[in-house]
Structure formats: C-alpha cells, structure tokens
Amino acid sequence: MEITEVRVQRVSPGNSLKAYANITFDDCFVLHNVRVIEGNDGLYIGMPSRKLSNGEFKNIAHPITAEFREKMTKAVLEVYEKTPIMPGQEAEI
C-alpha cells in the first residue's frame, strides 16, 4: 500500500495539537483527521478516534505494523514541516 497524497492543515498555536492531516492510499482510500501532536519526545501522529460512552477514546483506524506506522508518520511530518504557519492554510504532496 502506497501513500499517494498527504494534506496537512495547521491549527491555532498554543496547545499540543499542531495540525490535522488527511492521508490518501493508492489513490483510492483516504484517512481523515489524523492529528499531529507535540509530546515530550517531539512530534507524533494520532489516529482518528471516537469517544466511547465510558469516556475512553477508541481508534477508528490504525496501522497494524510498526513499519507502516513509521511510514505514515514520516510522510505526514514531512508535509507538516512544509505547511505555512498560518492556521487554515493547507499543504500537500
């Protein structure tokens, strides 16, 4: 499975959530609302999730292998670094 497009939109600065990304695979499937988050060890991506009735969050979709997660993270963060600082503007590859 190849990542064929990544779009990143920054959000307002001031908290750990830095941006949202949409990732397209093989020009036929898109994953929306992947989050770019700044943690204690740097930037990472968070998968789209929903809140359960007990208050916990559950991922809607996620990579199965560490290798594919790394591939997704690298692709998203490369585009994030190229994205204009102004929230609302979008960058893509």
Swiss-Prot record:
<keyword id="KW-0717">Septation</keyword>
<dbReference type="Pfam" id="PF04026">
    <property type="entry name" value="SpoVG"/>
</dbReference>
<dbReference type="GO" id="GO:0000917">
    <property type="term" value="P:division septum assembly"/>
</dbReference>
<comment type="similarity">
    <text>Belongs to the SpoVG family.</text>
</comment>
<dbReference type="InterPro" id="IPR036751">
    <property type="entry name" value="SpoVG_sf"/>
</dbReference>
<dbReference type="GO" id="GO:0030435">
    <property type="term" value="P:sporulation resulting in formation of a cellular spore"/>
</dbReference>
<protein>
    <recommendedName>
        <fullName>Putative septation protein SpoVG</fullName>
    </recommendedName>
</protein>
<dbReference type="InterPro" id="IPR007170">
    <property type="entry name" value="SpoVG"/>
</dbReference>
<keyword id="KW-0132">Cell division</keyword>
<keyword id="KW-0131">Cell cycle</keyword>
<comment type="function">
    <text>Could be involved in septation.</text>
</comment>
